[in-house]
Amino acid sequence: MECFQVFEAGEGIERAILRGLSARGGLRGRCANGGHPALLVVSPRAAARGTRLPRQCRTVLLPGGMGGVPPRAASAVSYGASPRDSLTISSREEGALWAALQRELVTVEGQVVERQEFSLPLAPGEEELPLLACAGALLLLGIPPEELGQALS
C-alpha cells in the first residue's frame, strides 16, 4: 500500500516531491487502499519511452497527449503546454514559471483545489514539464497552491 508512486527516467521528480513533502512534515492521513497507489505520477521521459505502468491507481498524473494505455483510475490529471491539459504553463519570467490550473482537482484526501494561477521557482536550465509534474503531485498530495513555491525551492 503506497501513497504515491513515480515512474520517471532520471528527471528527479520523486526526490523533489519527497523534499516538498518533508518541508511540511511529510504525508498525513490515509493515502491508499486495495494495494494500489493513491497517486501515480508519470514523468515526461517515462511517457515518451512507453514505460510499462501499473494497471490501476486511484489518481494518475500524466503528461498530456501521452500515448499507450493509461492505468485505470478514478481520476486523471494531465500536465503540459496544451490548453487542454489540467495543469499548464501560463507564462515564464526570469527565475519563475507561472502555472495555471485549468480545472478544479480533487486531492487524494478529497479536498477540492479551485482553478487558479501560481508561481513556481524555475532554476536556470531546469526543465519545465518535470517541474509541472512535481507541482501537480504536490497539489494532489495536499500541498496548497500558495505553498508550492516554497515547497519546490
Q: Residue ranges of each PLM-predicted region?
A:
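Phosphate-binding loop of NTP-binding sites
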Residues: 1-75
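Fold-independent oxyanion-binding glycine-rich loops
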Residues: 9-10, 42-45, 62-65, 79-81, ...
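Short, solvent-exposed linear motifs at loop/edge-of-secondary-structure regions
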Residues: 72-84
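Adenine nucleotide phosphate-binding catalytic loops in nucleotide-utilizing enzymes
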Residues: 81-153
